Amino acid sequence: MNNILKNDWNNYIGNEFEKDYYLKLRKNLAQEYKTKTIYPDMYNIFNALHYTAFDDVKVVILGQDPYHGPNQAHGLSFSVNPGVRTPPSLLNIYKELKDDIGCYIPNNGYLKKWADQGVLLLNTVLTVRAGEANSHKNIGWQIFTDNIIKVLNTREKPIVFILWGNNAIRKEELITNPKHHIIKSVHPSPLSASRGFFGSKPFSKTNEFLKNDNEIPIDWQIENL
């Protein structure tokens, strides 16, 4: 069980996989994957952790749960697989990115470039039933992802936490280390973006924090594929 995570995350949260809540979650998930269509593919569930090692995390962008349409989710919050239409929330993120720091709006929603630079794209719930948003919110994932946030909170090297929407902002209480930075606003969803997401400048603010902490800023431009 302890070999699920292949990088340094294993040292920090590897023991979660042995805990009762996780064993119950795993059993539940095995049944769900067997009998229903679940996203993402089971081999992609932990991609956020695989792509961004614990020691490499500079920024955390918290999402809610995976996209629930075909071929969209691949384990990174807000990101979709190449070749899939950019979802509305991500399109709004791109619009803010353009207004904030001048990035052009790309023809895809594949955010692995961010993950490779130290942006942990973490959903608070890591799986979902096809077509049923939030269908896995009560099966134990929140315990697991809360513990990820708690262990990041203990880190000496500062992290920028980007919290969009009430679901993410509720996690602010887990971030108690004064070394870290918190940027928060309403969610980029079309339902709320015009009430304070547009114009919030999270990307330039993040890079300002990173520069002040002597870290290399993030190159936020996602290129056309």
Swiss-Prot record:
InterPro entries: UDG_fam1, Ura-DNA_Glyclase_AS, Uracil-DNA_glycosylase-like, Uracil-DNA_glycosylase-like_sf
Subcellular location: Cytoplasm
GO cellular component, one term: cytoplasm
Major localisation: cytoplasm
Residues spanning the membrane: none
EC numbers for this chain: 3.2.2.27
Catalytic activity: Hydrolyzes single-stranded DNA or mismatched double-stranded DNA and polynucleotides, releasing free uracil
Gene3D superfamilies: Uracil-DNA glycosylase-like domain
GO molecular function list: uracil DNA N-glycosylase activity
GO biological process, any: base-excision repair, AP site formation via deaminated base removal
UniProt-listed NCBIfam families: PRK05254.1-1 (NF003588), PRK05254.1-2 (NF003589), PRK05254.1-4 (NF003591), PRK05254.1-5 (NF003592), ung (TIGR00628)
Protein's UniProt name: Uracil-DNA glycosylase
UniProt organism field: Clostridium botulinum (strain Eklund 17B / Type B)
